[in-house]
Amino acid sequence: MRVVIDQDLCGTTGQCVLTLPGTFRQREPDGVAEVCVATVPQALHAAVRLAASQCPVAAIRVIESDAGDDERASADPARSPAEAERHAAKDQRIPGGHDGTV
């Protein structure tokens, strides 16, 4: 199993770090989550799935793999409407706090 974080989507809440501090960390100074391990040990699979399910912005993706099989994502790789909306909203933000409206 592998786990990846969509760092553009990460809300910097730190929920994943609170759930599994040895697997996730928040980088300085922006607080965006990072994965600390290349592959997840078998003993932590359930906890990683829990962390992914608890992410408030659904930025964590668990990639399951079976020996000899191609990797497959645990969730549909297509974005949900809510996730697409969050990405669109984040893409429209302009640094400095101005949202671009007149």
Swiss-Prot record:
Example GO molecular function: iron ion binding
Stored InterPro entries: 3Fe4S_ferredoxin, Fe-S_cluster_ET
Role this protein plays: Electron transport protein for the cytochrome systems.
Annotated residues for binding of [3Fe-4S] cluster: C10, C16, C55
Cofactor note (record): Binds 1 [3Fe-4S] cluster.
Keywords: 3Fe-4S, Electron transport, Iron, Iron-sulfur, Metal-binding, Plasmid, Transport
Basic and acidic residues compositional bias, start-end: 82-93
Keyword Electron transport attached: yes
Protein name: Uncharacterized P450-system 3Fe-4S ferredoxin y4lB
Cofactor requirement: [3Fe-4S] cluster
Region annotated Disordered, chain positions: 66-102
Organism: Sinorhizobium fredii (strain NBRC 101917 / NGR234)
